[in-house]
């Protein structure tokens, strides 16, 4: 003879079973969705890799053509720059402080990207003795974001541990993964401002071997100012 089970207990068991099945279905759906998202992220990474490779090949071809014709190869003007604060902790003029804040270089060895245009270059001139900057390669941008990248989410500094952090904040702009973020910064895409503001200012180390002479400009054998493509060497030494 089967054991009597009160009606209220039967209802509770039924509800629990229904809830268990619903949660199992939800986990299954979430797993399938995440699998699909990962496939999309891999596809994007492969697409960008092909795009970067084609761009590099085009430059090589143009240089080769210039040599053959006896012409000079003129590289395209840089669209994005990376600035690093190397001086100035105490007793700064209010105008200098304001500009450093605009570039998000509040602390020593902070680094940040900025769009290269007439306005930004004129502004950067006002703080040149305190910063150095130059034009990062795609590889440098990638290493900065992967090795030292943190997101600014609701005013909090969050490590970029997975793509969902990017997607939650920038998905509405079509930026759903770290590779999207790198591409947007590298190409100075239509949502560069949003992508750049999403990134917390980079915290870099003192360069291996130290600075040469922070009192003088880079072109005079010192450290501050525009070091153009050689910013990549400095970033490498500070990662």
Curated annotation (Swiss-Prot):
* Family stated for the protein in its record: Belongs to the universal ribosomal protein uL30 family.
* Pfam families attached to this UniProt entry: Ribosomal_L30, Ribosomal_L30_N
What organism does the UniProt record list as the source? Tetrahymena thermophila
> Where does this protein have compositionally biased stretches of type Basic and acidic residues?
9-28
Protein known as = Large ribosomal subunit protein uL30
* GO terms for cellular component: cytosolic large ribosomal subunit
Recorded hits in InterPro entries, A to Z, give: Ribo_uL30_ferredoxin-like_sf, Ribosomal_uL30, Ribosomal_uL30_euk, Ribosomal_uL30_euk_arc, Ribosomal_uL30_ferredoxin-like, Ribosomal_uL30_N_euk
| Keyword Iron listed | no
* Any GO molecular function: structural constituent of ribosome
Record keyword Lyase present: no
Gene Ontology biological process terms, A to Z: maturation of LSU-rRNA from tricistronic rRNA transcript (SSU-rRNA, 5.8S rRNA, LSU-rRNA)
**Keywords on this record?**
Ribonucleoprotein, Ribosomal protein, RNA-binding
Annotated region Disordered: where? 1-37
